[in-house]
Amino acid sequence: MADQKKPLQGGATLPLMAMAALGVVFGDIGTSPLYTLSACLSAMSLQPTAVNLQGILSLIFWTLVLVVSVKYAWVIMRASNQGEGGAMALTALASHATGHSNRLRWWILSIGLLGAALFYGDGVITPAISVLSAIEGMEVASPAWKPLVIPLALGVIIGLFMVQRRGTAAISHLFGPSMLVWFLLLFGSGLTWIVADPQVLIALNPWYALQFFGIHGIGGLVILGAVVLAVTGAEALYADMGHFGARPIRMAWYFLVLPALALNYLGQGALLELDPSAIQNPFFMLFPAWATIPMVVISGIATVIASQSVISGAYSATRQALLLGYLPRQAIIHTSASERGQIYLPLLNWLLMVAVIVVILWFRSSNALSFAYGTAVTGTMLMTTILVFFVARHSWKWSLWKAGLFCGFFVLLDGVFFGANLLKFVEGGWFPLAIGLAVFTTMSTWRWGRGILASKLYPDTLSVEDFLSSVTPGDPIRVPGTAVYLTMREKAIPHALLHNLKHNKVLHERVVILTIKFEEEPRVLPANRVVVLDYGQGVRRLTARYGFMEHPDIPEILKSAENSDNLWNPLDTTYFVSRQRVIPTAKASLSLWREHLFAIMLRISANATDFFRLPPNLVMELGDVVEFSHKVPDAPKKEKTTQQ
């Protein structure tokens, strides 16, 4: 149950790593004070009376404590998959923990995919609501700025996505110090107003949270849909664990972020108790009038950093999903020579940009967007809690009552938050759910489609031994050089090899059948990377294993498999790859529209040449046309994921 701690890189001290984590992990949750309290009051059209404020502030504070401090920082961050966290890492852990039950694995996989899919709904709304809420601060300085809010927000968003291709390596070292300044401002501004009205501190008593529901009855549950805005971004504590390790993240949360957030929310409450007219924008009115524009600039920087963290998280999650075989291959561009984690996915970048622009133009204000925010976040939290139950039972060896008590409490809590957000479905809660459903459908369609495609391509597997038994010294003709054939199946003869033999009547002197397998773990030790099987007659099979945080290097694989009899010369090597095209039919187990969706995804999938970064002048691509008419079982057996 102990954490697998990531060593502090470059001799960095724990406080320095904690400060670096501020710029990556806490941007989303750190900018929540911009809009959370306003959203809570507008959710039920409440007046900022002392009783209402005490109840809301108590709910916000104890939500931060229970959801972030207890659930994520104390427990879920223990679910380390070789030091990595996140939806895919947790799904892999839960799947491994359950043993050999194929049906249970299938359900765990579905829950994990749904949780990962809902993350994209959050990823679209976070940049929109964060940037809008920061720029809306200009209205506090002068209402004349109001017509410029939308154009300025769109300009910031478009600029943010346009620079992604260049990467953030040059300025990322400034993110941590910038967010440190932000949290110190949250701390100081909140404390100033608490000193002016210390009575607000009674909201730390959980009794006032319960009293709120006593006053407002069952209708008071609506407020939870806005209260949860205070913990948006909590998943980042776990998702970014692989970058910094658990200790620096916990240190930053307990010693700076939590106190700063709590004091700022309490400070906003104190301000509203003393001046109810500040309901217009309680965050920016914490500061004197002369500081409004500087705070708009500073909050703008903080929200851009928060948005950048979400975008980078989307890149990372998508990369993991496509390497594990849940999404079509896409171009992955590394934007930093020194930081392997700094990547850029062009297609995803433009899809996200268009989606965020649509959100801003549709909702037009952070207050309206608050109705859309929350459904995806709470849905992801609920899926995470369910997966942690299996990890706690089978990996941590918790007793049934202990795992059931902990996870049961948080399933109930997450379920109440999720239900409260569903009450906002018509006002905008449908939007992130629609995005999550679309992503889940895409992932599941690709996964099932690949299974059907593999069963059609390899219905009767021809083994290498059977193939070689038909090869004689003069037939077929052996030509000089090395042929590398990429294939999905470990034991099958690649289609490209059979096509080449059928049409060209030749076989290379050296034949390498290469299968690349992506394991459900972040990394594979180099010693366990490549398995070589020599069949004789110049034919060898190489099976290379990679984790979902790694990218294959085919030349390195071939070089590692060298021996005195098989020296690899990259200049006399030809790479043979296959590319499939499917013909949808009504006979397949997928519905016809999903078959067409799979066919489209297959067409836009990056080819093996680009994905594996093979030299184009040394690649020969052969095609297969496949009719979809194969039935697959309801709960397919688990297979190692390959992407050839």
UniProtKB/Swiss-Prot annotation:
Q: What is its main location?
A: membrane
Q: According to its record, how does it sit in the membrane?
A: Multi-pass membrane protein
Give me the segments passing through the membrane. 10-30, 56-76, 106-126, 143-163, 175-195, 212-232, 252-272, 282-302, 343-363, 371-391, 403-423, 425-445
What Pfam families does the annotation carry? K_trans, K_trans_C
Name the GO cellular-component terms.
Answer: plasma membrane
Catalytic activities: K(+)(in) + H(+)(in) = K(+)(out) + H(+)(out)
Keyword GTP-binding included in the entry's annotation: no
The record's subcellular locations are: Cell inner membrane
Q: Which InterPro entries match?
A: K+_transporter, K_trans_C, K_trans_N, Kup
What are the record keywords, sorted? Cell inner membrane, Cell membrane, Ion transport, Membrane, Potassium, Potassium transport, Symport, Transmembrane, Transmembrane helix, Transport
**Does the record's keyword annotation contain Membrane?**
yes
Q: Name one GO molecular function term.
A: symporter activity
What's the family? Belongs to the HAK/KUP transporter (TC 2.A.72) family.
Write down the PANTHER family for this protein, in alphabetical order. LOW AFFINITY POTASSIUM TRANSPORT SYSTEM PROTEIN KUP, OSMOTIC STRESS POTASSIUM TRANSPORTER
The entry's function note states: Transport of potassium into the cell. Likely operates as a K(+):H(+) symporter.
According to UniProt, the name of this protein is Probable potassium transport system protein Kup
